[in-house]
Structure formats: C-alpha cells, structure tokens
UniProtKB/Swiss-Prot annotation:
<comment type="similarity">
    <text>Belongs to the shikimate kinase family.</text>
</comment>
<feature type="binding site">
    <location>
        <position position="153"/>
    </location>
    <ligand>
        <name>ATP</name>
    </ligand>
</feature>
<dbReference type="Pfam" id="PF01202">
    <property type="entry name" value="SKI"/>
</dbReference>
<feature type="binding site">
    <location>
        <position position="118"/>
    </location>
    <ligand>
        <name>ATP</name>
    </ligand>
</feature>
<feature type="binding site">
    <location>
        <position position="59"/>
    </location>
    <ligand>
        <name>substrate</name>
    </ligand>
</feature>
<dbReference type="InterPro" id="IPR027417">
    <property type="entry name" value="P-loop_NTPase"/>
</dbReference>
<feature type="binding site">
    <location>
        <position position="17"/>
    </location>
    <ligand>
        <name>Mg(2+)</name>
    </ligand>
</feature>
<dbReference type="InterPro" id="IPR023000">
    <property type="entry name" value="Shikimate_kinase_CS"/>
</dbReference>
<feature type="binding site">
    <location>
        <position position="81"/>
    </location>
    <ligand>
        <name>substrate</name>
    </ligand>
</feature>
<keyword id="KW-0479">Metal-binding</keyword>
<keyword id="KW-0418">Kinase</keyword>
<feature type="binding site">
    <location>
        <begin position="13"/>
        <end position="18"/>
    </location>
    <ligand>
        <name>ATP</name>
    </ligand>
</feature>
<protein>
    <recommendedName>
        <fullName>Shikimate kinase</fullName>
        <ecNumber>2.7.1.71</ecNumber>
    </recommendedName>
</protein>
<comment type="subunit">
    <text>Monomer.</text>
</comment>
<dbReference type="GO" id="GO:0005524">
    <property type="term" value="F:ATP binding"/>
</dbReference>
<dbReference type="GO" id="GO:0008652">
    <property type="term" value="P:amino acid biosynthetic process"/>
</dbReference>
<comment type="pathway">
    <text>Metabolic intermediate biosynthesis; chorismate biosynthesis; chorismate from D-erythrose 4-phosphate and phosphoenolpyruvate: step 5/7.</text>
</comment>
Amino acid sequence: MTVPRVVLVGPMGVGKSTVGALVAERLGCAYRDTDDDIVTAEGRTIADIFVDEGEPVFRAIEKRAVHTALAEHDGVLALGGGAILDADTRALLAGHRVVYLSMEVDEAVKRTGLNAARPLLAVNPRRQWRELMEARRHLYTEVARAVVATDGRGPEEVAQAVLDALELKEA
C-alpha cells in the first residue's frame, strides 16, 4: 500500500486543485484530485451526478474514490470539499499529512460566486457557504495536521505555506 505525501482538504473554491498541482510540482511527484477521478469513472460532471442521482449517491461514489486514491496514490492528493463528511474517510485520513486549506466567507463568495457547477451553492451562495462551513469546519480541523489560510494569498504563496507547515523540502 502506498501513502500520499500530502492530502489537501477544504471547502469548494479554496484552491485545492491549483495548490495541489503546485505542491506536487515542487515535491517532484504526481498530483491527483478525487473529483477528477469521479468525473472520469462516472463519465459525467459532479453537478450532473447531484442532479441525476442526489447527494447521497454522490457521497457514496466519492467515498469509494477517496478510499481508492488513499490506497493507490503516493503524491499529492486533493479531496472534494465534502469528502470529510464520511466518518470512515476521516478515520482513514488519520496518520496522513493532511492540510486544511481555509478561507473566509467573503473570499469564498469571490471565488465561487454563483457558479452553477457548484450544486451546493446554487441558491444564496453566501448563506449556503456559511452553513456548509458551520457543518464542516470542525471536521476539516479534526483530520488536519496543519491549517493554511488562503485569504489574500496567491496559489504560489499558499503552496509554499503548505510545504512549510509540513516541513517538506522541494525536490
């Protein structure tokens, strides 16, 4: 069994994909995103899965994708924003180098706006995002070895902060 060098968690729009690719590049390893794994395996977008099947079906698909990626991938891994909702997934993350990328609501609204591709924020994104974070923040913190705030920082700066937080050296 392989183990990811870094696992990134955090809300939608925080920059897990962008930062994850930069961290992987700096470490000289591969990058993987479980949202991409889901889209590839299912042959449709996450938004389509939500609309066609509902959130419970999506969460079951996501759980399988995360468990597979944690077992197979030895680089940098980004998880979907809601992956930490599953207790089994949180238990699997124990012992991994997990970094919670955080951001405040004003930054989140700037980044996610009214994007229709984000089904959980389709109506009143500011309120929805606050509610999601109230439900999830403690779960992100529970699984994380480090927390890196992304507000007002560019992806390069956040990537460096992730490396610094985990005391990892660039390749």
